[in-house]
Amino acid sequence: MSEKGRLFTSESVTEGHPDKICDAISDSILDALLAEDPCSRVAVETLVTTGQVHVVGEVTTLAKTAFADISNTVRERILDIGYDSSDKGFDGASCGVNIGIGAQSSDIAQGVNTAHEVRVEGAADPLDAQGAGDQGLMFGYAINDTPELMPLPIALAHRLARRLTEVRKNGVLPYLRSDGKTQVTIAYEDNVPVRLDTVVISTQHAAGVDLDATLAPDIREKVLNTVIDDLSHDTLDVSSVRVLVNPTGKFVLGGPMGDAGLTGRKIIVDTYGGWARHGGGAFSGKDPSKVDRSAAYAMRWVAKNIVAAGLAERIEVQVAYAIGKAAPVGLFVETFGTEAVDPAKIEKAIGEVFDLRPGAIIRDLHLLRPIYAQTAAYGHFGRTDVELPWEQLNKVDDLKRAI
């Protein structure tokens, strides 16, 4: 295609994908610990394979009951996803659960508990007391492609993945199984989405289901058409979509029996579908003292409010931290030529309106709550099915006043 015209593709996966099972387990453990002790420090990684779950990491907590009950938390989440029988390749009630969790490193804890600003610089502000849990760079992004200010390819891929799960769980298509993937390719002209080009839907199913006679027509009618009918987009042509359903022919063997899964292997699915840059840090299983998670949420909050305020049509913001320091060491703003005001003014307004110290992010977004398991599948940003604090548009007026 020409420079003005291009195709862009994003993918999503269902909650029964092996990697997403792991994200869900890690975040369910996190939520259970935070519910009992909001100050829990948690870094939990999960691996699943045929008949087995391995949970490892570092936890410092006063949540004795939740910690002792981790094995049951694991099993309950697997069963809720839909793996409840050996006939489906995995059973949360009978799988092996191995737990190997130690305490958070005291070397890391000292920098988080007492930041460089307090230890070395003598700062007195309470929000200077909490240092970043690690070094790193985090990105936030927003674009006016959709009402939720997300890139359209990933937004549509998530809607299809959620719909796959809905029709499985509510009995519309009872022969579907938990594992599945969606992929959306959209044609753009001058950065405007103009045509839905290709949709790929791969879904695990019961044995004996005919692809051509049953599965493909059902997926088109009950999943794709339903999502497209609900899609409100002025410029997108959906009249000639190429649809590929289970292009391997069948998908009976899935879940942890088909592939091993790990926490944190779907970071592009979790964020912006490849449309924006990524700092590399995964989210699931991490408490908000880890800026990989909390600062990425904060930067989405920043970006979304900037676009909603009309300061740019799309924006990417980067923040960077040093371990043990409260104040960010870097902030970068990219508006891709869509700004309504000087980007330098936008950057200055960010500094005036948003406090990006970890303690302030946790305070302003109320992050010491058990809200994370609901983010483990279908994206952390632009969610239309759950309310998340970093999606609120509560800084629009403040930004306008600051410009």
UniProtKB/Swiss-Prot annotation:
Region described as Flexible loop: spans on this chain: 104-114
InterPro entries: ADOMET_SYNTHASE_CS, S-AdoMet_synt_C, S-AdoMet_synt_central, S-AdoMet_synt_N, S-AdoMet_synthetase, S-AdoMet_synthetase_sfam
Subcellular location: Cytoplasm
GO molecular function: ATP binding; magnesium ion binding; methionine adenosyltransferase activity
Residue sites binding Mg(2+) per the record: 19
Cofactor annotation: Mg(2+); K(+)
Keyword Heme attached: no
Catalytic activity as recorded in UniProt: L-methionine + ATP + H2O = S-adenosyl-L-methionine + phosphate + diphosphate
Subunit description: Homotetramer; dimer of dimers.
Protein family per UniProt: Belongs to the AdoMet synthase family.
Positions that bind K(+): 45
Protein name, UniProt field: S-adenosylmethionine synthase
SUPFAM superfamilies in the cross-refs: S-adenosylmethionine synthetase
Organism the protein comes from: Mycobacterium leprae (strain TN)
Chief subcellular location: cytoplasm
